[in-house]
Protein backbone atom coordinates (compact mmCIF):
# COMPACT_ATOMS: atom_id res chain seq x y z
CA UNK A 1 0.00 0.00 0.00
CA UNK A 2 1.52 3.34 -1.07
CA UNK A 3 1.05 6.77 0.51
CA UNK A 4 -1.87 7.77 -1.78
CA UNK A 5 -3.77 4.55 -1.13
CA UNK A 6 -3.21 4.85 2.62
CA UNK A 7 -4.44 8.45 2.60
CA UNK A 8 -7.59 7.49 0.68
CA UNK A 9 -8.20 4.64 3.14
CA UNK A 10 -7.84 7.05 6.07
CA UNK A 11 -10.31 9.47 4.46
CA UNK A 12 -12.82 6.67 3.80
CA UNK A 13 -12.52 5.23 7.32
CA UNK A 14 -13.24 8.65 8.82
CA UNK A 15 -15.95 9.47 6.26
CA UNK A 16 -14.29 12.71 5.11
CA UNK A 17 -16.48 14.41 2.51
CA UNK A 18 -15.00 16.49 -0.32
CA UNK A 19 -16.80 19.80 -0.81
CA UNK A 20 -16.35 22.25 -3.73
CA UNK A 21 -14.14 25.26 -2.96
CA UNK A 22 -17.02 27.63 -3.67
CA UNK A 23 -19.21 25.95 -1.05
CA UNK A 24 -20.79 28.19 1.57
CA UNK A 25 -18.94 26.41 4.37
CA UNK A 26 -15.66 28.07 3.31
CA UNK A 27 -17.04 31.62 3.31
CA UNK A 28 -16.78 33.72 6.44
CA UNK A 29 -19.56 36.28 6.90
CA UNK A 30 -18.44 38.57 9.75
CA UNK A 31 -21.85 40.27 10.01
CA UNK A 32 -23.70 36.97 10.18
CA UNK A 33 -21.35 35.68 12.89
CA UNK A 34 -21.78 38.90 14.88
CA UNK A 35 -25.58 38.57 14.72
CA UNK A 36 -25.43 34.97 15.95
CA UNK A 37 -23.13 35.90 18.84
CA UNK A 38 -25.38 38.85 19.79
CA UNK A 39 -28.52 36.66 19.69
CA UNK A 40 -26.93 33.97 21.93
CA UNK A 41 -29.46 31.22 21.08
CA UNK A 42 -27.47 28.69 23.14
CA UNK A 43 -28.50 30.47 26.35
CA UNK A 44 -32.14 29.48 25.76
CA UNK A 45 -31.35 25.87 24.88
CA UNK A 46 -28.50 24.07 26.73
CA UNK A 47 -28.59 21.44 23.96
CA UNK A 48 -28.54 24.03 21.15
CA UNK A 49 -25.42 22.81 19.34
CA UNK A 50 -25.92 19.27 18.07
CA UNK A 51 -23.29 18.79 15.37
CA UNK A 52 -19.70 19.71 14.65
CA UNK A 53 -17.95 19.68 11.28
CA UNK A 54 -14.16 19.46 11.29
CA UNK A 55 -11.93 20.08 8.28
CA UNK A 56 -9.58 17.21 7.39
CA UNK A 57 -6.66 19.63 7.74
CA UNK A 58 -7.60 20.55 11.32
CA UNK A 59 -8.21 16.87 12.13
CA UNK A 60 -4.78 15.76 10.92
CA UNK A 61 -3.08 18.67 12.74
CA UNK A 62 -4.76 17.71 16.02
CA UNK A 63 -3.95 14.00 15.64
CA UNK A 64 -0.29 14.66 14.75
CA UNK A 65 0.08 17.08 17.67
CA UNK A 66 -1.52 14.61 20.08
CA UNK A 67 0.69 11.82 18.76
CA UNK A 68 3.84 13.92 19.21
CA UNK A 69 3.05 14.27 22.91
CA UNK A 70 3.39 10.54 23.54
CA UNK A 71 2.06 9.71 27.01
CA UNK A 72 1.83 13.41 27.97
CA UNK A 73 -1.31 15.45 27.40
CA UNK A 74 -1.11 18.26 24.84
CA UNK A 75 -3.42 21.19 24.19
CA UNK A 76 -4.38 23.46 21.30
CA UNK A 77 -6.97 25.88 20.00
CA UNK A 78 -9.42 25.64 17.08
CA UNK A 79 -10.57 28.36 14.68
CA UNK A 80 -13.92 28.36 12.92
CA UNK A 81 -17.49 29.61 12.95
CA UNK A 82 -21.06 28.58 13.75
CA UNK A 83 -23.96 27.91 11.41
CA UNK A 84 -27.43 27.15 12.80
CA UNK A 85 -26.99 24.25 15.26
CA UNK A 86 -23.59 23.32 13.87
CA UNK A 87 -20.09 24.33 14.92
CA UNK A 88 -17.53 24.35 12.10
CA UNK A 89 -13.80 23.92 12.77
CA UNK A 90 -11.68 25.23 9.89
CA UNK A 91 -8.18 25.10 11.42
CA UNK A 92 -6.29 24.22 14.59
CA UNK A 93 -2.97 25.14 16.17
CA UNK A 94 -0.91 23.81 19.06
CA UNK A 95 -0.28 25.75 22.28
CA UNK A 96 2.99 25.74 24.26
CA UNK A 97 1.63 24.27 27.49
CA UNK A 98 2.93 22.15 30.34
CA UNK A 99 1.44 18.68 30.13
CA UNK A 100 1.50 15.67 32.44
CA UNK A 101 0.09 12.17 32.03
CA UNK A 102 -3.21 13.23 33.60
CA UNK A 103 -3.71 16.94 32.94
CA UNK A 104 -2.60 19.91 30.88
CA UNK A 105 -2.13 23.47 32.15
CA UNK A 106 -2.04 26.67 30.10
CA UNK A 107 0.36 29.29 31.48
CA UNK A 108 0.94 32.98 30.58
CA UNK A 109 3.23 31.99 27.69
CA UNK A 110 0.39 30.01 26.09
CA UNK A 111 -2.03 32.94 26.30
CA UNK A 112 0.55 35.30 24.76
CA UNK A 113 1.17 32.82 21.94
CA UNK A 114 -2.58 32.43 21.41
CA UNK A 115 -3.08 36.20 21.06
CA UNK A 116 -0.14 36.58 18.66
CA UNK A 117 -1.34 33.68 16.51
CA UNK A 118 -4.90 35.05 16.26
CA UNK A 119 -3.60 38.49 15.24
CA UNK A 120 -1.25 37.00 12.63
CA UNK A 121 -4.08 34.86 11.22
CA UNK A 122 -6.27 37.93 10.72
CA UNK A 123 -3.41 39.74 8.96
CA UNK A 124 -3.34 37.02 6.29
CA UNK A 125 -7.12 37.03 5.84
CA UNK A 126 -8.17 34.25 8.23
CA UNK A 127 -11.05 35.98 10.00
CA UNK A 128 -12.38 32.96 11.91
CA UNK A 129 -12.59 33.26 15.68
CA UNK A 130 -11.59 30.70 18.29
CA UNK A 131 -14.47 28.23 18.60
CA UNK A 132 -12.96 25.67 20.92
CA UNK A 133 -9.98 23.94 22.46
CA UNK A 134 -8.63 20.42 22.11
CA UNK A 135 -6.43 18.25 24.26
CA UNK A 136 -5.33 14.63 24.36
CA UNK A 137 -6.13 11.67 26.60
CA UNK A 138 -3.29 9.24 25.77
CA UNK A 139 -4.70 5.73 26.13
CA UNK A 140 -7.80 6.36 28.23
CA UNK A 141 -10.54 7.39 25.83
CA UNK A 142 -12.46 10.49 24.80
CA UNK A 143 -14.43 12.02 27.67
CA UNK A 144 -14.17 15.03 29.99
CA UNK A 145 -12.54 14.76 33.42
CA UNK A 146 -13.53 16.98 36.34
CA UNK A 147 -10.81 19.51 35.44
CA UNK A 148 -11.88 19.42 31.77
CA UNK A 149 -15.52 20.07 32.74
CA UNK A 150 -14.51 23.06 34.89
CA UNK A 151 -12.32 24.46 32.08
CA UNK A 152 -15.07 24.04 29.49
CA UNK A 153 -17.71 25.61 31.77
CA UNK A 154 -15.41 28.61 32.20
CA UNK A 155 -14.89 28.85 28.45
CA UNK A 156 -18.63 28.65 27.77
CA UNK A 157 -19.22 31.41 30.31
CA UNK A 158 -16.80 33.92 28.77
CA UNK A 159 -15.99 32.76 25.21
CA UNK A 160 -19.20 31.39 23.71
CA UNK A 161 -19.65 29.68 21.34
CA UNK A 162 -16.99 27.19 22.45
CA UNK A 163 -16.50 23.43 22.20
CA UNK A 164 -14.11 20.94 23.82
CA UNK A 165 -12.48 18.20 21.75
CA UNK A 166 -10.60 15.22 23.17
CA UNK A 167 -8.23 13.10 21.06
CA UNK A 168 -6.79 9.75 22.11
CA UNK A 169 -3.60 9.32 20.04
CA UNK A 170 -2.80 5.89 21.47
CA UNK A 171 -6.15 4.42 20.41
CA UNK A 172 -5.98 6.09 17.02
CA UNK A 173 -4.77 3.32 14.72
CA UNK A 174 -2.72 4.04 11.59
CA UNK A 175 -4.98 4.29 8.50
CA UNK A 176 -7.97 3.73 10.78
CA UNK A 177 -10.72 5.67 12.48
CA UNK A 178 -9.55 8.57 14.63
CA UNK A 179 -10.52 8.28 18.30
CA UNK A 180 -11.98 11.75 18.87
CA UNK A 181 -14.90 13.21 20.84
CA UNK A 182 -16.49 16.68 20.87
CA UNK A 183 -18.37 17.92 23.94
CA UNK A 184 -20.26 20.85 25.44
CA UNK A 185 -21.11 21.27 29.10
CA UNK A 186 -24.53 21.99 30.58
CA UNK A 187 -25.12 25.13 32.69
CA UNK A 188 -24.72 24.72 36.45
CA UNK A 189 -27.86 23.35 38.06
CA UNK A 190 -29.27 21.98 34.79
CA UNK A 191 -30.52 18.39 34.94
CA UNK A 192 -30.33 16.75 31.51
CA UNK A 193 -33.07 14.35 30.39
CA UNK A 194 -32.30 10.66 30.25
CA UNK A 195 -30.23 10.23 27.13
CA UNK A 196 -29.37 7.16 25.12
CA UNK A 197 -26.00 5.72 26.15
CA UNK A 198 -23.16 6.85 23.91
CA UNK A 199 -20.89 4.42 22.10
CA UNK A 200 -19.13 2.12 24.56
CA UNK A 201 -15.49 2.86 25.25
CA UNK A 202 -12.91 1.32 27.52
CA UNK A 203 -12.24 3.38 30.66
CA UNK A 204 -9.28 2.38 32.89
CA UNK A 205 -10.25 1.39 36.44
CA UNK A 206 -8.35 4.33 37.96
CA UNK A 207 -10.35 6.75 35.75
CA UNK A 208 -13.84 5.24 36.12
CA UNK A 209 -14.74 7.28 39.21
CA UNK A 210 -13.72 10.58 37.57
CA UNK A 211 -15.64 9.60 34.43
CA UNK A 212 -18.79 8.55 36.32
CA UNK A 213 -19.00 11.60 38.58
CA UNK A 214 -18.97 14.13 35.72
CA UNK A 215 -20.50 12.23 32.77
CA UNK A 216 -23.92 13.90 33.24
CA UNK A 217 -22.46 17.42 33.14
CA UNK A 218 -21.81 17.44 29.40
CA UNK A 219 -23.08 15.93 26.16
CA UNK A 220 -21.38 14.77 22.93
CA UNK A 221 -21.82 16.38 19.52
CA UNK A 222 -22.27 14.44 16.31
CA UNK A 223 -18.96 14.65 14.41
CA UNK A 224 -18.38 14.79 10.65
CA UNK A 225 -15.33 15.73 8.57
CA UNK A 226 -14.90 17.60 5.30
CA UNK A 227 -12.20 18.81 2.92
CA UNK A 228 -11.98 20.90 -0.25
CA UNK A 229 -9.91 20.66 -3.40
CA UNK A 230 -7.86 23.59 -2.05
CA UNK A 231 -6.98 21.54 1.04
CA UNK A 232 -5.38 18.86 -1.11
CA UNK A 233 -1.81 20.25 -1.25
CA UNK A 234 -1.71 21.10 2.46
CA UNK A 235 -3.18 17.73 3.34
CA UNK A 236 -0.72 15.93 1.06
CA UNK A 237 2.20 17.73 2.70
CA UNK A 238 1.03 16.81 6.20
CA UNK A 239 0.14 13.27 5.19
CA UNK A 240 3.57 12.57 3.68
CA UNK A 241 5.17 13.47 7.01
CA UNK A 242 2.63 11.37 8.90
CA UNK A 243 3.00 8.45 6.47
CA UNK A 244 6.79 8.29 6.82
CA UNK A 245 6.45 8.21 10.61
CA UNK A 246 3.83 5.46 10.31
CA UNK A 247 6.05 3.25 8.15
CA UNK A 248 9.04 3.82 10.40
CA UNK A 249 7.24 2.87 13.62
CA UNK A 250 5.49 -0.16 15.04
CA UNK A 251 2.27 0.13 17.01
CA UNK A 252 3.23 -3.01 18.96
CA UNK A 253 6.52 -1.43 20.09
CA UNK A 254 5.33 2.17 20.43
CA UNK A 255 2.35 1.22 22.58
CA UNK A 256 4.08 -1.40 24.74
CA UNK A 257 3.36 0.50 27.97
CA UNK A 258 -0.24 1.08 26.92
CA UNK A 259 -0.76 -2.63 26.14
CA UNK A 260 0.81 -3.68 29.45
CA UNK A 261 -1.38 -1.15 31.27
CA UNK A 262 -4.49 -2.51 29.53
CA UNK A 263 -3.70 -6.09 30.60
CA UNK A 264 -3.09 -5.01 34.21
CA UNK A 265 -6.30 -2.97 34.16
CA UNK A 266 -8.27 -5.99 32.86
CA UNK A 267 -6.77 -8.13 35.62
CA UNK A 268 -7.94 -5.66 38.29
CA UNK A 269 -11.43 -5.45 36.75
CA UNK A 270 -11.78 -9.25 36.70
CA UNK A 271 -10.57 -9.48 40.30
CA UNK A 272 -13.11 -6.84 41.33
CA UNK A 273 -15.90 -8.78 39.57
CA UNK A 274 -14.83 -11.99 41.31
CA UNK A 275 -15.07 -10.28 44.71
CA UNK A 276 -18.67 -9.23 44.00
CA UNK A 277 -19.60 -12.78 42.92
CA UNK A 278 -18.84 -14.17 46.36
CA UNK A 279 -21.23 -11.85 48.22
CA UNK A 280 -24.43 -13.62 47.23
CA UNK A 281 -27.04 -10.82 46.99
CA UNK A 282 -29.00 -10.19 43.78
CA UNK A 283 -27.72 -6.61 43.59
CA UNK A 284 -24.10 -7.70 43.84
CA UNK A 285 -24.62 -10.51 41.31
CA UNK A 286 -26.16 -8.08 38.81
CA UNK A 287 -23.33 -5.60 39.39
CA UNK A 288 -20.78 -8.37 38.97
CA UNK A 289 -22.38 -9.52 35.69
CA UNK A 290 -22.27 -5.93 34.43
CA UNK A 291 -18.60 -5.63 35.37
CA UNK A 292 -17.81 -8.99 33.75
CA UNK A 293 -19.62 -7.94 30.57
CA UNK A 294 -17.62 -4.72 30.37
CA UNK A 295 -14.35 -6.53 31.12
CA UNK A 296 -15.13 -8.99 28.29
CA UNK A 297 -15.72 -6.13 25.84
CA UNK A 298 -12.49 -4.46 26.97
CA UNK A 299 -10.62 -7.73 26.49
CA UNK A 300 -12.04 -8.17 22.97
CA UNK A 301 -11.07 -4.63 22.01
CA UNK A 302 -7.51 -5.06 23.32
CA UNK A 303 -7.16 -8.34 21.40
CA UNK A 304 -8.37 -6.75 18.15
CA UNK A 305 -5.92 -3.85 18.57
CA UNK A 306 -3.03 -6.29 19.06
CA UNK A 307 -4.07 -8.35 16.02
CA UNK A 308 -4.23 -5.19 13.89
CA UNK A 309 -0.73 -4.21 15.05
CA UNK A 310 0.60 -7.69 14.26
CA UNK A 311 -1.03 -7.68 10.80
CA UNK A 312 0.52 -4.28 10.03
CA UNK A 313 3.97 -5.64 10.94
CA UNK A 314 3.46 -8.69 8.70
CA UNK A 315 2.41 -6.50 5.75
CA UNK A 316 5.44 -4.20 6.18
CA UNK A 317 7.71 -7.23 6.50
CA UNK A 318 6.37 -8.67 3.23
CA UNK A 319 6.68 -5.31 1.45
CA UNK A 320 10.15 -4.22 2.55
CA UNK A 321 12.01 -7.38 3.57
CA UNK A 322 10.66 -9.38 0.59
CA UNK A 323 10.17 -12.50 2.65
CA UNK A 324 9.56 -15.53 0.44
CA UNK A 325 10.48 -13.73 -2.81
CA UNK A 326 13.07 -16.31 -3.75
CA UNK A 327 10.77 -19.30 -3.31
Swiss-Prot record:
CDD domains referenced in this protein's UniProt entry, alphabetically: MPN_RPN11_CSN5 (cd08069)
Compartments reported by the entry: Cytoplasm; Nucleus
Enzyme class, spelled out: hydrolase
Domain MPN, residue spans: 52-189
Phenotypic consequence of residue 100 to I: In csn5-3; disrupts R cell projections. Impairs the interaction with Trc8
Modified residues (Phosphothreonine): 303
Residues bearing PTM Phosphoserine: 300, 302
Entry-linked Gene3D superfamilies: Cytidine Deaminase, domain 2
GO BP terms, alphabetized: axonogenesis; compound eye photoreceptor cell differentiation; female germ-line stem cell population maintenance; germ cell development; germarium-derived cystoblast division; glial cell migration; male germ-line cyst encapsulation; negative regulation of hemocyte proliferation
Binding locations of Zn(2+): 135, 137, 148
Tissue-by-tissue expression: Expressed in the optic lobe neuropil.
GO MF annotation list: deNEDDylase activity; metal ion binding; metal-dependent deNEDDylase activity; metallopeptidase activity
Keywords: Cytoplasm, Developmental protein, Differentiation, Hydrolase, Metal-binding, Metalloprotease, Nucleus, Oogenesis, Phosphoprotein, Protease, Signalosome, Zinc
Keyword rRNA-binding: no
Pfam families linked: CSN5_C, JAB
Mutation effect (residue 137 to A): Abolishes ability to deneddylate cul1
EC number of this enzyme: 3.4.-.-
Motif extent (JAMM motif): 135-148
InterPro entries, per database record: CSN5_C, JAMM/MPN+_dom, JAMM_MPN+_peptidase_M67A, MPN
PANTHER family listed in its UniProt record: EUKARYOTIC TRANSLATION INITIATION FACTOR 3 -RELATED
Function: Probable protease subunit of the COP9 signalosome complex (CSN), a complex involved in various cellular and developmental processes. The CSN complex is an essential regulator of the ubiquitin (Ubl) conjugation pathway by mediating the deneddylation of the cullin subunits of the SCF-type E3 ligase complexes, leading to decrease the Ubl ligase activity of SCF. In the complex, it probably acts as the catalytic center that mediates the cleavage of Nedd8 from cullins. It however has no metalloprotease activity by itself and requires the other subunits of the CSN complex.
Family under the similarity heading: Belongs to the peptidase M67A family. CSN5 subfamily.
Domain notes: The JAMM motif is essential for the protease activity of the CSN complex resulting in deneddylation of cullins. It constitutes the catalytic center of the complex.
Complex formation: Component of the CSN complex, probably composed of CSN1b, alien/CSN2, CSN3, CSN4, CSN5, CSN6, CSN7 and CSN8. Interacts directly with CSN2. Also exists as monomeric form. Interacts via its MPN domain with Trc8.
The protein's name: COP9 signalosome complex subunit 5
Annotated organism of origin: Drosophila melanogaster (Fruit fly)
Amino acid sequence: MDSDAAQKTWELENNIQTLPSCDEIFRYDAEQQRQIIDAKPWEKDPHFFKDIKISALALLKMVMHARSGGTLEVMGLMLGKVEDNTMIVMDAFALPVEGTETRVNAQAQAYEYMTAYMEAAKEVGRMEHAVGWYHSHPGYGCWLSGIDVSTQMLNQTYQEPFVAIVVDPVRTVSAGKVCLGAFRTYPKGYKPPNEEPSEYQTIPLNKIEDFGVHCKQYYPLEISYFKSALDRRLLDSLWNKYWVNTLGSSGLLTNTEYTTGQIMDLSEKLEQSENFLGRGTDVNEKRSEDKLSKATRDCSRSTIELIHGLMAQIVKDKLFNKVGLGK
